[in-house]
């Protein structure tokens, strides 16, 4: 494949992402260019994987045999046969796993190591890659997700004209792959390519940007980047140079004068969302081998794209369980086989390099490596809460798989305690792992732990005003309300009941607050406003004047209605 939209001097074939030698040759000119500039660039960036059909590398067969234990050349007829059958699917699964391993170790991790040798950090968009997204995102210092198009919100008055939008791909489950990778691997920053194609050029309002930004922050992003801020020289004909993909954040756009208000809001949110550590209590296993074992209509090379979620995410037990956990009020991070292998148990808590968790849920899946199953049993015996929605039916891959299946059956027979509960939520409650029932009001939230206290980011994307006492799953606390838009703050009215603190909130549609728990009230009381129900109609004519814009201004006008 040729490089898309190449910069000057950058045209030609794309890099071989599965070859250490290719990466070494690729970075050689940059070694010279960055001499004396080590540490002077904060981070280098790798965009989403948009290299299509890169299904081979010169030493692939040798790497495959080393990793999978058999000679793929002897199975090419099954590999390339597009028939949906067990042995062909197993060989395709091995092929896809090998591509994933090579991408992770030959490029992504090696690229980050090279950047560290220059004292740079790395930002990586792993989506679109033909590999395990969790492991790939986690290989970078700053995992980065992407929003594309416009998402629907119930906020009254929010304009979403069909002719000006592209339907959005910012599914909360997809967004959580990047933040989960950051959380379980101990990376504090999660970035995003934000507002890509939110509306057509010059048709985006800041009010339309705000809920989109809120949705990604609610799913773990705390380091927003714009898409895009286009350079445009003074000599350019009005309205200046434009990037093909909107939004156009620059001085030629009418929203530019008021954009600082949006930027201030995002900055205030991120300053709190970067403090402390994530406070998600549940881990959810991503059974990627079920995706790799899928025939995919005979397609050998398979990419996990954000624009084709129906091919690999929608309709899976993993997706459904994630949505159900979110709906119930549980905070969840995803985990891969690799990170399960690194997990430990301390006093019943699952410990990873990035944090601690109260439970690990395994959604119903067909294929699971023996090593993963054995590790889960080990964690359970050590006191961890491991909940199986369904037990695996087989092992992945082709090499000696029938023997592997027998071993799997024996392990399951020897561990009859691995029963699947009828209701995972009752199983969680039995472990005293309770959800945040505030979601029953329609409010959305994300929670962080800052020095033992909880910080909640709460957003009202409903069409209703929420005016009630909202329960927080923390006992005997005072609560500080902070408004990130106006910078107002004060201590809320609270009622303390058992292990719950009830907080008085009044939130209009589209409004967002931070709630910070504390042992003793530290600030003045929060001001609660109440409407007196009166309305004041505005009558008469309006003088409409156009004082800015170009290249020509419309004529002034007098209108009777707005």
Task: Describe the function of each predicted region.
Residues 1-35:
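Catalytic and substrate-binding clefts that recognize carbohydrates or anionic sugar/phosphate headgroups
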Residues 30-43, 48-143, 148-562:
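Carbohydrate-binding surfaces of carbohydrate-active enzymes
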């Amino acid at each position: 494949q040729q490089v898309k939209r190449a910069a000057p001097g950058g045209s030609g074939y794309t890099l071989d992402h599965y070859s250490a030698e290719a990466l070494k040759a690729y970075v050689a000119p940059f070694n010279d260019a960055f001499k004396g500039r080590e540490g002077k660039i904060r981070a280098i960036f790798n965009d989403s994987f948009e290299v299509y059909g890169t299904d081979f590398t010169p030493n692939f067969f040798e790497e495959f045999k080393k990793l999978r234990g058999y000679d793929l050349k002897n199975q090419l007829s099954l590999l390339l046969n597009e028939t949906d059958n067990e042995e062909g699917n197993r060989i395709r699964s091995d092929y896809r796993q090998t591509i994933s391993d090579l991408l992770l170790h030959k490029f992504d991790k090696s690229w980050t190591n090279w950047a560290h040798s220059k004292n740079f950090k790395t930002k990586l968009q792993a989506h679109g890659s033909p590999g395990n997204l969790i492991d790939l995102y986690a290989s970078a210092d700053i995992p980065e997700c992407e929003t594309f198009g416009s998402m629907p919100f119930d906020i009254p008055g929010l304009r979403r004209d069909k002719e000006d939008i592209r339907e959005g791909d910012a599914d909360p489950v997809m967004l959580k792959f990047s933040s989960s990778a950051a959380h379980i691997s101990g990376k504090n920053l999660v970035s995003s390519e934000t507002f890509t194609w939110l509306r057509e050029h010059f048709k985006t309002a800041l009010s339309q940007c705000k809920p989109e930004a809120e949705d990604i922050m609610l799913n773990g992003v705390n380091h927003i980047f714009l898409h895009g801020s286009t350079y445009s020289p003074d000599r350019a004909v009005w309205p200046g140079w434009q990037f093909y993909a909107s939004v156009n954040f620059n001085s030629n756009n009418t929203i530019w004068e008021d954009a600082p208000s949006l930027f201030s809001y995002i900055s205030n949110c991120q300053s709190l969302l970067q403090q402390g550590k994530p406070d998600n209590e549940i881990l959810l296993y991503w059974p990627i081998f079920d995706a790799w074992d899928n025939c995919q209509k005979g397609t050998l090379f398979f990419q996990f794209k954000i624009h084709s979620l129906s091919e690999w995410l929608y309709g899976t037990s993993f997706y459904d369980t994630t949505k159900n956990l979110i709906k119930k009020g549980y905070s969840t991070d995803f985990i891969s086989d690799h990170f399960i292998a690194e997990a430990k148990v301390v006093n019943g808590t699952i410990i990873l390099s990035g944090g601690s968790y109260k439970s690990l849920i395994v959604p119903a899946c067909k294929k699971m490596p023996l090593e993963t199953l054995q590790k889960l049993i080990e964690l359970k015996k050590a006191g961890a809460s491991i909940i199986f929605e369904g037990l695996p039916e087989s092992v992945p891959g082709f090499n000696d798989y029938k023997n592997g299946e027998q071993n799997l059956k024996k392990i399951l027979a020897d561990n009859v305690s691995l029963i699947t509960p009828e209701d995972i939520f009752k199983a969680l409650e039995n472990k005293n792992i309770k959800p945040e029932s505030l979601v029953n009001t329609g409010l959305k939230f994300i929670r962080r732990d800052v020095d033992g206290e909880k910080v909640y980011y709460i957003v009202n994307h409903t069409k209703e005003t929420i005016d009630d006492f909202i329960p927080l799953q923390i006992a005997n606390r005072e609560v500080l309300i902070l408004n990130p838009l106006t910078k107002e703050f004060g201590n809320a009215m609270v009622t303390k009941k058992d292990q719950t603190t009830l907080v008085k909130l009044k939130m209009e549609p589209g409004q967002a607050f931070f709630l910070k728990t504390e042992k003793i009230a530290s600030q003045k009381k929060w001001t609660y406003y109440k409407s007196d129900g009166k309305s004041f109609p505005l009558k008469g004519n309006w003088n409409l004047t156009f004082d800015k814009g170009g290249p020509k201004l419309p004529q002034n006008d007098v209108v009777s209605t707005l």
